[in-house]
């Protein structure tokens, strides 16, 4: 029975270790931004569901509201640049949508800083959505840097995955505080996270079977990439989440503008750094695939899908011409 099983996710923040060396201030603020986003999602949903208006909402409106929340997160642990999350397997379909939308929300805040051409030093780009007052009482914007996670998801019985108190030593005494995760399914999730490059989500074959059944018309977002490894095309939910327009074309156009464009800029900037650019190239493939899946699931004709491909290709071409021509000129 699925209600006896727990989904466990392990997510790692890409580039964080290197960022702590080159720009520790931004690394710290990005980590804080992740925590703040999770906290605000949790608190916002409590406020919504405790409001007088909520009880009068239709079931469809309530369902839509919860898609953007984190109501399925039974456990969520933030440790340094990683996240550990647990959810009941009966909520599998809603959990992957909520997780995907969380990743979209976190990524979008920073990606909007890269919609224009990136200067010679990426650290010269300020994060326009964040500011603080320094010791001289000047308002400052920290450097912008993408917040992208790669993750692994697995599943096991509740007895196999244990969220238990952390044992800490304080003043030479043991005190249980916070949570830790142990269990073979968690170890499997950690191993799955390392399967590929870029901000991707990989899951076990056991979890994939449950998702393919529960996702119904959206089951195509789960694809097999190895014998026992599947990938969740979470960028499909990015198209849904970034615009929320009733017209699918408007959502696709918005994803091309606000997701594809900044990642193209980042790929162009890191083009000569093979170890870094591979992550953005994989992200570009993932965005492309997510947009086409969205079009297909929304019953686009073959002619309409070809038009979407043309729009993405034109965006790709214009961006790369802009980058390479400017490189030639310099």
Region annotations inferred by a language model:
Residues 155, 184-207:
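Catalytic/regulatory signature loops of cyclic-dinucleotide turnover enzymes
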Residues 145, 183-184:
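Short, glycine/acidic-rich beta->alpha junctions
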Residues 198-330:
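Intrinsically disordered, glycine/charged-rich C-terminal tails and inter-domain linkers
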Residues 85, 89-138, 165, 169-172:
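A broadly used, surface-exposed interaction patch
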